[in-house]
Structure formats: C-alpha cells, structure tokens
Amino acid sequence: MNKIRKGDEVIVITGKDKGKRGVVLAVGAEHVTVEGINLVKKHVKPNPMKGTTGGVEAKTMPLHISNVALVDANGKASRVGIKVEDGKKVRFLKTTGAVLSA
C-alpha cells in the first residue's frame, strides 16, 4: 500500500522547492509528480506532423517520494502510517491521528 496517492495534498520538505505545496498528479515506484513543483524548461523543436510550434515550455518533473510529506489539517507536514481497521488497511496521519480516505 502506497503512503502517498494521486490527489493527495503534499508539501516539499527538501530541495529547491522546499515549503511549496501542491496536489499529486502521478505516483511511480519511487517518484511523485506534483502540480506546479519542480518545473524545468524544455526546448521543443517544431513538428508540423503533430502541429506543435517550437520554443521553450515549462514541464513538471517527478520528485523522489522521500522529499515530500502529506499536509495535515493544520497545514503542517505529517508522516503517514498504516493500520488495520475493520479488517482493512487504512492510512492515517501520525501528527493528528486522522484517518485518510481511501
């Protein structure tokens, strides 16, 4: 069970974007892509077959999953735990103990 899932609100805890918040767009094995975080400029060639014009565009790149933490109700970074409730595994915030929705 992944501790961070698509749609979770996270805060970056290390790196150049430290302190910024965003919503998780995609989760990989060890990386997460967060909306508006870790933007890089990508130079793109024009391609008439695809109908794209050339230029420089901003692209969101993945972060390592250890560099982000979930945000609790108070706006603070929180670690995530997993416990069994009613025979099912659920995620909960370690700072507040609040159970996260599936």
Curated annotation (Swiss-Prot):
One of its GO terms (biological process) is translation. One of its GO terms (molecular function) is rRNA binding. Keywords: Ribonucleoprotein, Ribosomal protein, RNA-binding, rRNA-binding. Pfam families: KOW, ribosomal_L24. CDD domains: KOW_RPL26 (cd06089). One of two assembly initiator proteins, it binds directly to the 5'-end of the 23S rRNA, where it nucleates assembly of the 50S subunit. Part of the 50S ribosomal subunit. This is Large ribosomal subunit protein uL24.
